[in-house]
Design a protein with these regions (language model features):
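Proline/serine/threonine-rich low-complexity linkers at boundaries of modular beta-sandwich domains
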Residues: 12-24, 133-144
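Structural beta-strand segments of beta-rich domains
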Residues: 26-28, 36-42, 146-148, 156-162
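Short amphipathic, basic-aromatic surface patches that mediate peripheral association
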Residues: 46-58, 166-178
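Short beta-strand elements bearing conserved aromatic residues within extracellular beta-rich modules
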Residues: 67-69, 187-189
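Short beta-strand segments within Ig-like beta-sandwich modules, predominantly Fibronectin type-III
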Residues: 74-81, 194-201
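Short, flexible loop/turn segments at beta-strand junctions in immunoglobulin-like
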Residues: 86-90, 206-210
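Short acidic/polar inter-strand loop motif in beta-rich domains
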Residues: 101-109, 221-229
């Protein structure tokens, strides 16, 4: 099962910069790899920086914040994990930039310059269809099945934030779309049964939801995108319903 091309996009530009005033300024570095199923995986490393998903869109606290992902100068995602998948790229050179954002979405600056990491990545040709065809085959999780919970809260600025608790499974962004390794994998998130994205960590921003009672479901998948099931054959997943509007 491959990912849709433009998942969880969060375009536009946010607030002006906020100068970091402390002695130990944050740093950010990034690495980009081609995902075997299409798209790219972006890996982020920081120092002196706390990703605070629960404080997103609230008052500025120095040293806290989240990430913004830009592709060719356009903001496409707000994200909270140190690895993120993005499918909305095509073959050729793309400029990938990760920006350190404060809780209130101001860009962190140092000496007046934004604190960012940037690289140009050549997206390889991808010859087969990136979209899924039918349901993936289930894989029985070896040993005790992991536990999975999800809660969803309105974001004070826009959209919603989903918070996931997972115990007993290794989230392995570096092996996504690779060979199956027992106990490893990633998560898929769904809105009313429609796949929204692939997750490598415990929190994600959902830019918009339809009005009404909306089901948010998170499910565990193998590295090669097969659904994990427990010994009884039931999918390892969690869901919650959000009233929107």
């Amino acid at each position: 099962m491959a990912d849709d091309g433009h998942e969880m996009t969060d375009g536009g530009h946010d607030h002006a910069g906020v100068e970091f005033e402390g002695a130990d300024a944050p740093t950010v570095a990034l690495d980009v790899t081609a995902d075997p199923a299409g798209g790219i995986n972006v890996f982020v490393e920081t120092t002196n920086y706390v990703v605070a998903a629960e404080s997103a869109s609230t008052e500025h606290v120095e040293g806290e914040g989240h990430f913004h992902l830009y592709i060719d100068g356009e903001k496409v995602l707000r994200f909270y994990n140190e690895a993120v998948y993005f499918g909305g790229v095509t073959e050729g050179d793309v400029e990938v930039m990760v920006e350190l954002s404060a809780n209130d979405h101001s860009t962190y600056t140092l000496g007046g310059e934004p604190i960012v990491a940037m690289t140009t990545f050549t997206v390889p040709a991808h010859s087969h269809d990136d979209h899924s065809h039918g349901d993936p085959e289930p894989v029985v999780f070896e040993g005790d099945a992991p536990t999975l919970e999800v809660t969803v809260e309105p974001d004070p600025k826009s959209g919603y934030n989903a918070f996931i608790t997972l115990d007993g499974m290794v989230l392995s962004a570096e092996n996504a779309s690779g060979d199956h390794v027992a106990g490893e994998g990633h998560l898929h998130i769904y809105v009313n049964g429609q796949k929204l994205g692939r997750l490598y960590g415990p929190a994600t921003h959902i830019p918009v939801l339809p009005d009404g009672d909306v089901e948010i479901r998170v499910a565990a998948y193998t590295n090669d995108h097969m659904v994990y099931v427990d010994g009884a054959g039931d999918p390892i997943e969690a869901s919650t319903t959000v009233e929107v509007g």
